[in-house]
Design a protein with these regions (language model features):
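Soluble catalytic domains of enzymes that build or remodel membrane lipids, polysaccharides, and related
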Residues: 1-168
């Protein structure tokens, strides 16, 4: 699914797995989309997948819109109780109060905890990178592997996480 926008916030989601009822949503700003979809895994199980790229806070502006979007998604996930994965450039660092509140609101796990920082931005400055790109998951998953991949031409490095869904 693709939703191109000229403002830099267009989104695309490509999957080898079946996407179920994918939708582009505008939770807090008509110019900032997010994606929600079901994904049918090879096992036949279905999970919820959220793709987010909230607007970064600008100098002399607060981050209220970004914060609201993250907390709304977190609360939605917690309310469903279903296996869920959230991924994207959250324009925030892992140790910020906003990111911690997002994880609390959704009862989400950050797979980088205990594994490293996985710094992804800016790709062109290896010594000055920090983590802006995320994969969060609910308690239904365990982490098999997580790593940052080499530069691809983006200003962010790719982040890959291999998660296993607990089938019990």
């Amino acid at each position: 699914m693709t939703y191109p926008l000229s403002n830099g916030y267009g989104m695309s989601l490509f999957s080898r797995l079946e996407l179920l009822q994918p939708i582009v949503r505008f939770l807090v700003d008509d110019a900032i989309p997010s994606i929600k979809t079901g994904v049918r895994l090879r096992s036949g199980a279905v999970i919820d997948l959220y793709g987010l790229h909230p607007q970064p806070p600008a100098p002399l502006q607060d981050s209220t819109e970004r914060d609201v979007e993250l907390v709304l998604v977190g609360m939605e996930i917690k309310g469903t109780g279903r296996p869920s994965v959230v991924l994207g450039d959250l324009n925030d660092v892992a140790w910020s109060p906003t990111t911690e509140e997002f994880a609390r609101a959704g009862d989400l796990r950050d797979p980088r905890r205990g594994r490293g920082f996985f710094n992804t931005y800016p790709a062109r400055l290896p010594g000055l990178r920090y983590p802006l790109d995320y994969v969060f998951h609910t308690k239904h998953f365990s982490v098999r592997n997580m790593r940052v991949l080499p530069k691809t031409g983006s200003d962010h490095l790719p982040l890959i996480a291999v998660l296993d869904l607990d089938q019990t």
